[in-house]
Amino acid sequence: MQPSPTHRASFSIGSEAAARRVVDVLTEVFFEGDAAVAAFERPDGQWDVTLHFADAPDQAWLRELVVNSAGNEIADTLAFDTVEAKDWVKASLEDLVPVPAGRFVVHGSHDRDRVAPNKLKIEIEAALAFGTGHHGTTRGCLLLLDHVLKSSRPSNVLDLGTGTGVLAIAAAKALHRAVLASDIDPPSVRVAAENGRLNEVGHHVRVIRATGFAAPDFARAGPFDLVLANILANPLRHLASPMARHLAPGARVILSGLLTHQAPAVIAAYRARGLVPLRHLRIEGWSSLLLRKVG
Ligand SMILES: C[S@@+](CC[C@H](N)C(=O)[O-])C[C@H]1O[C@@H](n2cnc3c(N)ncnc32)[C@H](O)[C@@H]1O
């Protein structure tokens, strides 16, 4: 899930239990954000796991790590290559069709005139950041945001881990209110700000660079009554405490980026900080959660 991958390692796994084990190990090892881990279940029940690295990984070390956590079965399928990040993202965006999600539709510039007029359009320009709407986690967040907006108008919104800015732009377009967006990754900060302007909500979406809640802007802008955070399970668990401190009573939180088997641990971490789960969407092996702060 890193925005500017150039080196790739991929392998397949036959059992869900082994896939769970190896994804847990890899997301733990790469918590610092120097690699992005993605896992997809194929229709035949096999799992494809892909890692993207900004710097070339030590192949022998990585092979040992995945074989130790997933077993010898993956050894023959493990392959390393490099991808031209910009061309790869551009090419994949050009192939993509608009993605409807509730009242929203996410599309590229080539589809500007072809999307349904009754939807809130979010145009995402080809860029080195995550979040075109096609991934199950982004779609899950948009669907839960749509659900929240049916019964309330949050007044203070945070999109933590904004990537292309897709969720912040969706919230700003629907609410016509200021949204704070943050990302650990400088290119994503630039891309999200550009996409905010492209979608004519640049005056509402303020994008900052921050790791988790480590910036004074959060205390100044908070407490938030809606937080969207589509990052991995491990960072989400670590962020439970600081997030709870930045929430208004009754605030809603939308979490995504976790594989479905990781949801119970994430729910437990947030429940311990006074957040109760309201909804659980499962899309393509990924979970998106809606929680509410009690009191
Ligand atoms: C899966 S992408 C989500 C992008 C977009 N919000 C979406 O829903 O499609 C996760 C984003 O979170 C950022 N990120 C990861 N860990 C973070 C952290 N601890 N603090 C802030 N941003 C983080 C990554 O750089 C990446 O842009």
From Swiss-Prot:
GO terms for cellular component: cytoplasm. GO terms for molecular function: protein methyltransferase activity; protein-lysine N-methyltransferase activity. Coiled coil: none annotated. Its EC number is 2.1.1.-. The keyword Nucleotide-binding does not apply. GO terms for biological process: methylation. Keywords: Cytoplasm, Methyltransferase, S-adenosyl-L-methionine, Transferase. Belongs to the methyltransferase superfamily. PrmA family. This is Ribosomal protein L11 methyltransferase. The lineage of its organism: Bacteria, Pseudomonadati, Pseudomonadota, Alphaproteobacteria, Hyphomicrobiales. The gene is prmA.
